[in-house]
Amino acid sequence: MTQAILQLSEIEKAFPGVKALDKASLNVYPGRVMALMGENGAGKSTLMKVLTGIYHMDAGSIQYQGQPAAFKGPRDSQEAGISIIHQELNLIPELTIAENIFLGREFTGSMGRIQWSKMYAEADRLLQRLNVKHSSKTLLGDLSLGEQQMVEIAKALSFESKVIIMDEPTDALTDTETESLFKVINELREQGCGIVYISHRLKEIFEICDDITVLRDGKFIGECRVADTDEDGLIEMMVGRKLEEQYPRIDVKHGETCLEVVGLTGSGVHDVSFTLKRGEILGISGLMGAGRTELMKVIYGALPSEHGVINLDNKTINPVSPQDGLANGIAYISEDRKGDGLVLGLSVKENMSLCALDKLTKGVQIQHGEEVIAVEDFIKLFNIKTPTRDQIIGNLSGGNQQKVAIAKGLMTKPKVLILDEPTRGVDVGAKKEIYQLINKFKADGMSIILVSSEMPEVLGMSDRILVMHEGRITGEFDAKDADQEKLLACAVGKKINEEAA
C-alpha cells in the first residue's frame, strides 16, 4: 500500500475519571477513503480533536507528509491542508453562503476592500460542484439542515485540503444529497486527497470507503481493506462480540386506545388521523420534508395546530406549548438532541431532571435526594457511561447523550413517548441497547411513536406503520404486511392502505 500522508501513532489522552485514548492509531493514505469506525465513546472524535490541536495528546506521535507535526488549533491544521467537517455545523445562519465559506479569509483588493463578485463566483463554483441549487448570496438560515451540511463541505473544499475528515457527513442529507457528496468524494480520491470517513451507516462504509480502522474503548483494534471484511465481521471488531438479532421486537398484548388524532392540520401537517394503543409502537416513516417531525411537534404543542382533535385517554387536549405537552403526559425526544433536547453545559443529572422538576418538588423545595435516586436509577437502567452523574453532558459520547435525552423524557412519567430519530448518529451497540429499552417501555404498557428515516428500523421495531408524504398520511400497514418497497412507494406519494383488520 502507498505511504500514508498522515499517521497518528499510539496516541494517549486522559480526562478526569476516564482514559479516552489508549494507544490509538490511524493511517490516512493519499487517494483513498479511510473509514474510522467504533461505538460511541470509542475515541473517534477525541482522536480527531487531538489531530487538529483542540486537545493536546498525553503521549504518541503525529506525522504529516513525512514530517513530525503538532498543530496549535483547527486554524493551524486547516492552513496546513487538513480540514474537518464536524457533525455539529460551524456556520452562521445570519450570513450568506459565500460569507460562511470564506469567513475570515474574504477576497480583498489592494485597498483592502472585499471583492464580492469574485467571492460569490468562487462560492457558486463550489456549490455547483456539490449540486447545490442555491445562489451563494442566499442567507444560510434559509437552507435546510442537509443543505447547510453541503455548505460546510463546500467550505472544506475551498481550502484545497490534502486531508479531509468527514464526521457523520450524511446524517442530515437526503439520498440525492448523499449521491452528490459521494461523487465529490470520488473526485477528491482521484485528485490524491486522503479522506477520513466517520459514520455508523455500514452500508455507506462498504459503498464509498477503501480501508477501515476500528477503535474500541480508546484502543486501536485493527486496520483492514473494505474488500477483506463484511458487516458481521466489522460489527464484531467494533463491539468485541457478535450481535445477534439486530431488531429485537417483542410481542405485547395491546391495551385500550391511549391517543387518538382526528383531522389534525397545522404547520406542515394536513388532515392527519390515527390512533395509538397502550403497549404499541407506531412507526412513522417518510422522506425528509414529509412532515413527520412537524406532526409530532403539533401533537406535543411545539408547533401550532389550525384545526383537528387530539384525544388522550378519552379527553380532548389542546397543547399550545411544550409545557402543555409535558403536563398532558406526552414526552417528545427531539431528532436534534443538541439543539432541542439537551443543554450541553449542564450535567447529566441536571439535564435528566430538567423537565421533571414539578414531580421532584414539594412546596418550593426540590427534593434533591429523590432526584439523585431517580437519576442514578436511569444511569444504571440505561447503562449510561459517565464517570459521575455530575459529569458535563457535552463530554459524553453521542450514544450516551441520546440515552440521557430519552431518560429525560421518561423522568416526566409520560403516557405517550415520542422518539424522533432515536438512533441517529448512534453506533450499532448503543442502537441495540436503545431498542431493548424501547421494548421494556412497550412491555410496561407505554404508548410509543417511533419516527425514523431508517426503513429497516421502522420495519424491525414497529407494530404498525404510518407513511407520510407532503404532510399527509399516504399509507398504513401492520408491520407483518409491510416491506421497504411498499413504504418507499407511499413515501413518494403513492397511496396504499393495507392495515390488517
Swiss-Prot record:
<dbReference type="GO" id="GO:0005886">
    <property type="term" value="C:plasma membrane"/>
</dbReference>
<dbReference type="GO" id="GO:0015611">
    <property type="term" value="F:ABC-type D-ribose transporter activity"/>
</dbReference>
<feature type="domain" description="ABC transporter 1">
    <location>
        <begin position="6"/>
        <end position="242"/>
    </location>
</feature>
<dbReference type="Pfam" id="PF00005">
    <property type="entry name" value="ABC_tran"/>
</dbReference>
<keyword id="KW-0472">Membrane</keyword>
<comment type="similarity">
    <text>Belongs to the ABC transporter superfamily. Ribose importer (TC 3.A.1.2.1) family.</text>
</comment>
<keyword id="KW-0762">Sugar transport</keyword>
<feature type="domain" description="ABC transporter 2">
    <location>
        <begin position="253"/>
        <end position="495"/>
    </location>
</feature>
<keyword id="KW-0547">Nucleotide-binding</keyword>
<protein>
    <recommendedName>
        <fullName>Ribose import ATP-binding protein RbsA</fullName>
        <ecNumber>7.5.2.7</ecNumber>
    </recommendedName>
</protein>
<keyword id="KW-1003">Cell membrane</keyword>
<dbReference type="InterPro" id="IPR003439">
    <property type="entry name" value="ABC_transporter-like_ATP-bd"/>
</dbReference>
<keyword id="KW-1278">Translocase</keyword>
<dbReference type="InterPro" id="IPR050107">
    <property type="entry name" value="ABC_carbohydrate_import_ATPase"/>
</dbReference>
<comment type="function">
    <text>Part of the ABC transporter complex RbsABC involved in ribose import. Responsible for energy coupling to the transport system.</text>
</comment>
<dbReference type="InterPro" id="IPR027417">
    <property type="entry name" value="P-loop_NTPase"/>
</dbReference>
<comment type="subunit">
    <text>The complex is composed of an ATP-binding protein (RbsA), two transmembrane proteins (RbsC) and a solute-binding protein (RbsB).</text>
</comment>
<dbReference type="InterPro" id="IPR003593">
    <property type="entry name" value="AAA+_ATPase"/>
</dbReference>
<keyword id="KW-0997">Cell inner membrane</keyword>
<keyword id="KW-0813">Transport</keyword>
<feature type="binding site">
    <location>
        <begin position="38"/>
        <end position="45"/>
    </location>
    <ligand>
        <name>ATP</name>
    </ligand>
</feature>
<dbReference type="GO" id="GO:0016887">
    <property type="term" value="F:ATP hydrolysis activity"/>
</dbReference>
<dbReference type="GO" id="GO:0005524">
    <property type="term" value="F:ATP binding"/>
</dbReference>
<dbReference type="InterPro" id="IPR017871">
    <property type="entry name" value="ABC_transporter-like_CS"/>
</dbReference>
<keyword id="KW-0677">Repeat</keyword>
<keyword id="KW-0067">ATP-binding</keyword>
